[in-house]
Amino acid sequence: MAIVTGMAQALIPANIGPISIEYETMGEATNPAILLIQGFGAQLINWPDQFCQMLVNQGFYVIRFDNRDCGLSTKLDGVVVDPNAVFAAALTGQEIPPVPYTLSDLAQDAVELLNHLGLGTAHILGASMGGMIAQTLVIEHPERARSLISLYSVTGEFEIGAPTAEAAEALLGPPPTDRQAYIDASPKYGVWQSKRYFDEVAVKREAARAFDRSFYPEGSSRQLAAIYASGSRAEELQKLQTPTLVIHGTDDTLLPPDGGKRTAELVPGSTFLLVADMGHDLPEPLLPLITGAMAAHMKLAEWQRATGH
């Protein structure tokens, strides 16, 4: 079994003043660390426990946390932003309206969490928006990354990897505020999940777990504005020298696989793994394949780091 610290709070400096980041660690702290960065509106518990355990079993020290404006981390209550106005400005090349924070600020939060834990470096894994944050972290703080894993994410080029209309509607529509209604509505997210492995009972169970821990749809508009305001990373990705693995599913309709393919095309020497029957999620039957690929990538990066290859 993994050594689990239980939830803890890190008080870190940020662009808006000190904030609290809720985090959890699993495994031996002396092992190479992997920092797991979640996506839009997703909490640390959205990383499946079994997924984390598999990485621990492969010899890694796993850290998962709540981004600001999500879960049990600091929330910017009452800070109003119009993500549609930000998107329109970004799309037309106009001046971006003020936003509370950008992906760079979220990446800095992750770096400050590493500082809090006394870790100089870690493997950086990000899923969806978390992949955007992970890419930004490695671009802006390359010395902190032992490797990069970009999981069903995109480059910030708006024309590549855009969601289908059905997926966008499911993502951006206001969720029910009543607990039972929220749980009952959760299968709608199946539109972008792995169809072959879709389990409605499990989806509703996880929705209940997430709702009971923290229901905070208000944070989504600010996270979305951060994505839009940050723009394309294409130019910077071409300069990366960090060992990079890009993973995407063939059935992803939220961020379709051309976004992952483009990421891998841009990052020099990167590896692209396209997983059949995988959507915008981590279904249990695919966890051995996915964690195995991640572990092999990180172990190769560790060997290259140790030998200078």
Short names for language-model regions:
Residues 240, 246-248:
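Short beta-strand/loop motif that positions the catalytic acidic residue
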Residues 19-93:
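Conserved HGGG/HGGXW glycine-rich cap/lid loop of the alpha/beta-hydrolase fold
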Residues 270-309:
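Catalytic active-site module of serine/aspartate enzymes centered on a nucleophile-bearing elbow/loop
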Residues 163-235, 239, 262:
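Alpha/beta-hydrolase
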